[in-house]
């Protein structure tokens, strides 16, 4: 009797538990934007694209998130000349990431920001060989 009650309670709790959720896509988009900003703003830096793809998988992002975010970032940074416009939510996430990154760069100064990114984004950016 106790075993049956335990099983029913366990099954009920499992049914009520929220499903595992992917980490916030906005956090991933910000990470990507910072990696690409470091490539452009910090001399001798390049992006390790495959590691960004792996990070998306680790964060349980939907397939294609890295590529759609890359295209949206390019589209916004080039005024629509490169990349592709993403859905409104993605474009909002990219715009917010751009604003926060810009504020960080101004607050810290570019050299300090670059030095910080080398540590913060280790694995996603590296020095050019």
Locate predicted features.
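Positively charged n-region of N-terminal signal peptides that target proteins for export
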Residues: 1-5
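Bacterial N-terminal signal peptides
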Residues: 6-15
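Processing junctions and N-termini across compartments
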Residues: 16, 36, 107-108
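Sec/Tat signal peptide C-region and signal peptidase I cleavage site
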Residues: 16-22
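Compact alpha-helical subdomains of small soluble proteins
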Residues: 54-129
């Amino acid at each position: 009797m106790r075993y049956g009650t335990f099983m029913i309670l366990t099954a009920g709790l499992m049914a009520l538990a929220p499903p595992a959720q992917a980490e916030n896509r906005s956090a991933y988009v910000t990470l990507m934007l910072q990696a690409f900003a470091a490539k452009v703003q910090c001399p001798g830096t390049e992006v390790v694209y495959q590691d960004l793809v792996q990070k998306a998988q680790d964060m349980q992002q939907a397939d294609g998130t890295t590529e759609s975010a890359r295209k949206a970032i390019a589209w916004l940074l080039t005024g629509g000349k490169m990349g592709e416009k993403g859905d409104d939510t993605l474009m909002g996430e990219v715009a917010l990431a751009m604003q926060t990154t810009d504020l960080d760069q101004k607050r810290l100064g570019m050299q300090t920001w670059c030095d910080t990114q080398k540590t913060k984004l280790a694995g996603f950016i590296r020095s050019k060989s």
